[in-house]
Amino acid sequence: VIIIGGGICGCALAYFLALDGVEVTLLERSGLNSASSGANSGSLHGQIPHETFLDKGEEWAHTFGPTLSLMHESIQLWKKIEESLETDLEIRLTGGLLVAKNDKEIKAIRAKAAIEKKFGIHSEHLDKSQLRKFAPYLSEDTIGAMYYPEEGKANPLLVTPAFALKAEILGVQITRQAEVKGILVKRKGFRVDTTKGSFTCNRVVNCAGIDVGSINAMVGLANKVFAEPIQSNVTEPMEQLVDHLIYSAGERLTLKQTLHGSFIIGGGWPCLINKITGRLLICFDSFIRNLTVATGVVPSLESAQLVRTWPAWVNATDDWIPILGEADSIRGFFVCAFPYLGFTGGPISARILADMILS
């Protein structure tokens, strides 16, 4: 098996296959964990994304619903990953809070929770008095929240390298700086041509993240995946205050505190693209609005010093639905694309693909 892409899904898949004795080569065009898998903010999600629910509506939410089962199964794998990989990945599953500040927002979070319940995701509504005891760090104008216990965080700088290290110990050949230039579909198997030479195999798995589409095009497959530019922020370390993964029902927000005390603030706010170089640039408007939402939800953040804001690409689709499995028209060619929530869904995506290949 040749795996294209050294992010969380590619490295986890290499590890799972190697555990079962499969001969695996992983090709990475740059460095491992150098794109979305390492540049995301480390949230482990279990809910329908609220901002998207508001944008796309209840019909879309029902279509997205089955993806919640994948996310739930992935969270179950996350609970075991540190033991399997024998290392601390700073995984904490203390639950997520979607907070509301007015009756309109309360109505919306209840409507979303009702749909999630149909797919086995059971959130608990907390009123203002309950929140004061449960999460006293929230602003006083917060009037309620939905709490889902199966959410949390992990350190994205540690997870993918840990999978890769174990995979290499098990015999996986990882070739870095190997950009794929073409794929030849042979009568039996494939030839993958790269800047580090050509490789032959029986099966190819496309785990190339934002480049899934360009790899698919090499074998004539249609593409639904595109790259979306977003940015995140991190503060200086502060005294431990926030236990949960925090969302806002008002505007985009994900907020969590790392084990080292820093706050990571995101939510999918867009960044800019230099039209000449193609490089990503910080969007000042997104920066201000994101931090305004964050301090409005957790007022103690107003005294925090910001350390860094960074832009990154995330792989996306219009419908947010994962693409996992073997191409109908090309036997032995598999695709893995888990849009927007790929850090959460990486382990289960890899496990599913490994089971498909092994069967």
Which residue ranges define each predicted feature?
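N-terminal Rossmann-like FAD-binding beta1-loop-alpha1 element of flavoenzymes
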Residues: 1-26
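Dinucleotide-binding Rossmann-like beta1-alpha1 core, especially the glycine-rich loop
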Residues: 43-130, 252
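Helical element adjacent to the flavin cofactor pocket in flavoenzyme catalytic cores
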Residues: 145-202
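Glycine-rich FAD pyrophosphate-binding loop
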Residues: 18-40
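C-terminal catalytic lobe of FAD-dependent flavoproteins
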Residues: 123, 292-359
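Flavin-dependent oxidoreductases
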Residues: 12, 19, 57-65, 183-285, ...
